[in-house]
Swiss-Prot record:
Xref: InterPro entries: Ribosomal_Su5_D2-typ_SF, Ribsml_uS5_D2-typ_fold_subgr, RNase_P
Protein's UniProt name: Ribonuclease P protein component
Catalysed reaction equations from the record: Endonucleolytic cleavage of RNA, removing 5'-extranucleotides from tRNA precursor
Protein function: RNaseP catalyzes the removal of the 5'-leader sequence from pre-tRNA to produce the mature 5'-terminus. It can also cleave other RNA substrates such as 4.5S RNA. The protein component plays an auxiliary but essential role in vivo by binding to the 5'-leader sequence and broadening the substrate specificity of the ribozyme.
Phylogenetic classification of the source organism: Bacteria, Bacillati, Actinomycetota, Actinomycetes, Bifidobacteriales
Family: Belongs to the RnpA family.
Record's subunit section: Consists of a catalytic RNA component (M1 or rnpB) and a protein subunit.
PANTHER family recorded: RIBONUCLEASE P PROTEIN COMPONENT
Origin species: Bifidobacterium longum (strain NCC 2705)
Entries under SUPFAM superfamilies matching the protein: Ribosomal protein S5 domain 2-like
Single biological process term from Gene Ontology: tRNA 5'-leader removal
Length: 119
């Protein structure tokens, strides 16, 4: 899974207002329409993390980001092949257990896949 790096990419995903979430996380997603390249077998999933100062100090925020990266990699196969994801942490994510975050991300990614399949 690649990373969303530019501010423009983050804003594009967040402005679409498509989201799924849980108690401690919100998953904003965007599935681009122009993904019909020469090779459709390639997978282009990009992940961005949004962990604000309301979550905690720098050490806490970095811990939350590390957890999100590990869990997103573990569940990325649930997502459509071409999509941009922004995982946004709610303040309660700092105190949530790893198992709880794991369940929430798996459920949110499955919800994203279901919503994309319906559209």
């Amino acid at each position: 899974m690649e990373r969303l790096q530019s501010h423009r990419d983050f804003v594009t995903v967040l402005k679409r207002r498509r989201k799924a979430g849980g108690k401690d996380i919100v998953v904003h997603y965007l599935v681009p329409d122009d993904h019909h390249d020469d090779d459709d077998r390639t997978v282009h999933r990009r992940l961005g993390l949004a962990v604000s100062k309301s979550v905690g100090h720098a050490v806490t925020r970095n811990t939350v980001k590390r957890r999100f990266r590990v869990l997103a990699r573990a569940h990325e196969d649930l997502l459509p092949a071409h999509c941009d994801i922004v995982l946004r942490a709610k303040p309660s994510a700092a105190t949530a257990s790893f198992a709880s975050l794991d369940q929430q991300i798996a459920k949110a990614f499955a919800t994203v896949a279901h919503k994309v399949a319906e559209a």
